[in-house]
Amino acid sequence: MDRRVFISSIAGGLLTVPVAAGAQQAGRPPRIGWLSAGSQPDPFLEGFREGLRRLGYVEGQTIAFEIRHAQGSLEALLAGAAELAQSNVVLIVASLTAVRAARALKDIPILFTISGDPVEAGLVRSLSRPGGNLTGITFLSLEVAGKRVEFLKQALPRLRTLAALSNTDHPGEKSELRATETAAQALGINLIYVAFSQSPFGASPELGKALERIRRAQPDAMVVFPEGATMANRLDLANFGIAQRLPSIFGWSEYADAGGLMSYGASQRDTHARLAIYADKILKGAKPGDLPIEQPTKFELVINLKTAKALGLTIPPSLLQRADQVIE
């Protein structure tokens, strides 16, 4: 599906929905809507719940949830957003794709997590003062992009050519590419930029074509930019790296769990737990537009030794000592 068609479908699907949120019934705990394009079990929802528990909330007593998982269906996502609009939720929590389905609900505060740039995505006016009814956390960190290249170089001292797999539909993709290029140049590495376009819903042949271009180029290693499309295809990407004997680094631990050699980035579960702090502030009267977009400051390096063995690669002890988690 074309990106513009996707966004217009979302807008059209919600323009006719009357908003009935905000009128919380007396004696009932405030209800938070959780809108996800994915499926259950949902570790990010569990992270958010954990964050609320740390703040003293008790589900069913001082807080309640209305949960909608779209299972990868645009129609289900639109229906879920419409249902939440009618369910007296005082707040909606959503990822980027789901936010695009819910953003027409101007009267309901919306908290989001996004792997890219929320300003470039058109969600907020600025990181410091988002404005409107949205705020949240971005995973995008250009410093982290450079560190991924450095970690690959430590694992592969003879690294000379590096493929960078990137989704051009991802907001902030160009900034992440520039940071990766800068790090590669500083280390004497030739970067091969391989782009594909993946809409939030529906299969796309472009990712397979991009992987075929990487196979033909025969780079020494691969860096995969973290976002929704590569996350959804993380198992295929990990298997590709193993089959091609191509050491690869990814953005989140879920990629390494799926068989990727390494990952470096913020913990998604911990970040969703931090999102509960913003939920608490909004429940206590803060306006989303006054809460600055947060960027993670803590990152974790995960190394999959099973994959290293399959690749015939020995990870240096110094890099293993640096790892926050080693999968054996």
Locate each region found by the language model:
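Short hydrophobic alpha-helices and adjacent helix-cap/hinge residues
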Residues: 1-328
